[in-house]
Amino acid sequence: MEKQNFVVLKNICKRFGSNTVIGNLDLEIKKGSLVTLLGPSGCGKTTVLRLVAGLEKPTSGQIFIDGEDVTERSIQQRDICMVFQSYALFPHMSLYENVAYGLKMLKLPSEEVRQRVDEALKIVDLEGMGERYVDQISGGQQQRVALARALVLKPKVLLFDEPLSNLDANLRRSMRETIRELQQRFDITSLYVTHDQAEAFAVSDTVIVMKQGDIMQIGTPQELYKAPKSMFMANFMGEANMFQGHFDGQQIHINGYAIDADLEVTRDKPNGEYQIGVRPEAITLHTQGSESQACQILKSAYMGSMYEVTVKWHDQELLLQLNSAQFNHTLTQHAYVVFNPRGLFLLPYAE
C-alpha cells in the first residue's frame, strides 16, 4: 500500500524584502520516508527547512503536517525536532541533562523522563555515558547526543540541517549510517538538508535537487545519477563526458562509434539528435577495437580504489574511472574506448 503524503508544501513563496528566495514551490514527503534537499549554496534548501520548522513564515502558500495546516503555527506547535550542524548542546549540562531537557519542558514524570533518556542514549550507543559533559566527548559523540535529544521526544517530523558538516570523513560515513538506520527503525518522516551528494545518496529515499529557489529534479539517488533531465543535473550529480550524437531507434551513434541502445536509457526517446552523456565509470579501455574507438592515453592518477585516466578521443579529452584490474596501460599508448550502454543518458540537443 502506498504511503500517504505526511508533509506537504503548496505554492510556497518566500521573499526577503525584494529578493525572492523561494518561488511557487510544491513539495511532498511521504510518511516514514527520508527526503533530502540537495543543492549548491544559496539555492534555498535551508530556507525550505526553516519554513517546515516554523522558524520562517512563507510570504504565501500553505504548509501541512499530518493533514493539518500548520502555516501559522510556531515551531513548538508543530511536533517536530531539529538536528543542527552545530549540535546546539548545553555545555554546562551533562549528556543526560541535554537529552532530558525537552522532556522536562513537557513536565513529564521524572521516572518516565529517566526511562526515555536511558533508552535514547542506548539507541545511539552512548549507554552509561550520561554523566559526562560535552567537552569530554568527541564530535561524533556530540552529534549522537543531539540525535538522541531529538529522538527522545518522538516527534512527528525530524529535520536535519547539514548535521555532519563539522565531522571528518570517517565520522561522516559512520554517522550517516547511524542516521539512516535509526530513521528506518523508528519510521520517522524526515527532511534532510545537505550540499554533499554522497551524503544525500547514502541517507535518502528521495532526493530533491534545488537551484536558485526552484526544484530542478526529484527522484531516487539512482534516478538522478543515471537519468538527469538537464545539463545542470548532469554536471551537478557527478562528472560526465558530453557529446553530440544521434539515436536511430536501435543504436546510439557518437563520432562514428555505434553503441547498442539500452531500453532503460532510450525508453520514450524518439529518433533524432541528442546531447549524450557518459559517466567516467561507464567507459573502459580495450587493446582492440574499431577505428572509431581508438584513443590515446594522456595521463593517469592513482586514487587508491581506482585510477582516474584522461584519454584523447576524436579531439576531445575524456575522463575515465577504472579500477586497478581494468587499467594496465602505459601513458601515450593507444587503446580503444568501450562505452557501457547502461552508463549513457540522453538530453535534448537544443538545450
From Swiss-Prot:
Q: How does it sit in the membrane?
A: Peripheral membrane protein
Give the matching SMART domains: AAA
Compartment annotation: Cell inner membrane
Entry's Pfam families? ABC_tran, TOBE_2
Keyword vocabulary terms for this entry: ATP-binding, Cell inner membrane, Cell membrane, Ion transport, Iron, Iron transport, Membrane, Nucleotide-binding, Translocase, Transport
| A single GO cellular-component term on record | ATP-binding cassette (ABC) transporter complex
Q: Indicate the enzyme's highest-level EC class.
A: translocase
Q: Which GO terms describe its biological process?
A: transmembrane transport
An example Gene Ontology molecular-function term: ATP hydrolysis activity
**Ranges of residues in domain ABC transporter:** 7-237
State the function annotated in the UniProt record.
Part of the ABC transporter complex FbpABC involved in Fe(3+) ions import. Responsible for energy coupling to the transport system.
NCBIfam families cross-referenced by the UniProt entry = PRK11432.1 (NF008513)
Know the name of this protein? Fe(3+) ions import ATP-binding protein FbpC
Q: What is the primary gene name for this protein?
A: fbpC
